[in-house]
Amino acid sequence: MEQEICVVSFSGGQDSTTLAVWAKKRFKKVYLVGFDYAQKHSVELECAQKIASLLQLPYEIISLDFLENITRSALFKNSNDLMGHSHVQNKDLPNSFVPNRNAIFITLLHSYAQKIGASNIALGVSQADFSGYPDCKEDFIKSIEHALNLGSNTAIKILTPLMFLNKAQEFQMAKDLGVLDLVIKETHTCYQGERKILHAYGYGCNECPACQLRKKGYEEFQTKVLFQ
């Protein structure tokens, strides 16, 4: 029975919403878990709650607001750093990177999975079309899966069906799953928390790295649709 339970890391964004629908079609029980880490775009939590209700899936938020007190990122509410620059702690990374964020998320998801008897965790990470975050790469995910299972004497699988999909392919996946309209109108990606203007690709400021990546992906998706 436990093989039929999946815990989905759920932010209310394009990736995690597509992932949630994917999981719902494959597992008997799906639990959505989100994180409040004092992010500027906390409106995503409101979007996540609405989407969870529309999908009729249980949703729980874990508070991690202490993160902004122990590390630095342009994503935090207390940050005055402008997006699009290098991280002050590591010039090779964008300043929107939150050090060890995914490691913390995955560790907590792993504990949650043990609590409810789930043998699967699903993440919406991708290394094909991403923002330069090393903790979204396959080698990191495989390594932390191995470490957490060693430390807990478990065999919980971390599933990453979007790992090698770019944004255009993710839009196609959403279309194939029958939720393209939901992804465009209800999900949130914008780092600035902007939800006043609905663009063709969804709501956003149209300027931050997240919006630019999503816009580019949608335009590529539309181009492929036209030539199909």
Swiss-Prot record:
Give an example GO biological process: queuosine biosynthetic process
Q: What class of enzyme is it?
A: ligase
- What does the entry list as the binding residues for Zn(2+)? 190, 205, 208, 211
Q: Which residues bind ATP?
A: 10-20
CDD domains for the chain? QueC-like
The prosthetic group or cofactor this protein requires is: Zn(2+)
Give an example GO molecular function.
ligase activity, forming carbon-nitrogen bonds
**Coiled-coil boundaries:** none
Key word Ligase present in the record? yes
- EC annotation? 6.3.4.20
Q: Its family?
A: Belongs to the QueC family.
Q: What does this protein do?
A: Catalyzes the ATP-dependent conversion of 7-carboxy-7-deazaguanine (CDG) to 7-cyano-7-deazaguanine (preQ(0)).
UniProt name for this protein: 7-cyano-7-deazaguanine synthase
The organism of origin for this protein: Helicobacter pylori (strain HPAG1)
